[in-house]
Amino acid sequence: NDVMKKNDKAYVIINSTQMKETLVAFGHNEKTSNKILIIGGGNVGFNLAKNIEQSFDEARLKIIEKDKSRAEFIANQLNNTIVINGNGLDEDILTEVNLEDVETVIALTNDDEDNLMVSVLVEKFAKDLKEIDDKRTMALINKPNYSLLQSSLKIDDLIDPRMNTVSSILKHVHKGTIENAYTI
């Protein structure tokens, strides 16, 4: 039928030049974040930072990485990213990175629980600073049941690797004519 109901899925194919207008039409009117904090310097966090450095000159990136040797490696590989060796769950570390200046926090550790907790901590900090609407939190989750916690934990976006895989598959199936696939 032609009626959209709650939990229905719709696929919209558009020209990439219409992306911003389409996202706005679906209620995703978001400004570009220039001050980004990545928690976790594993492959996902490192590659995201590398991609942002190459694509967005205005971006100011910081990465918090627990493992000292990994933090040193990342610091040597990236040109315009500040790398801090520490635990993203440590409130002193979050204070040290000037969390009040950060626009978006992306938790990309290998631990779902840590990613969720970092996001909750950031929301707590933002609320304490009376900046609750100014921070965007994103957390990588591998366990599908954790998506049920998103609204109660007040996390803006959950990153589900399975959905990103769907995006990649769609791009290849349509032989490169799809630039990106988004869940909206």
Question: Which residues does each predicted region cover?
Answer:
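Cytosolic regulatory regions of ion transport systems
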Residues: 1-184
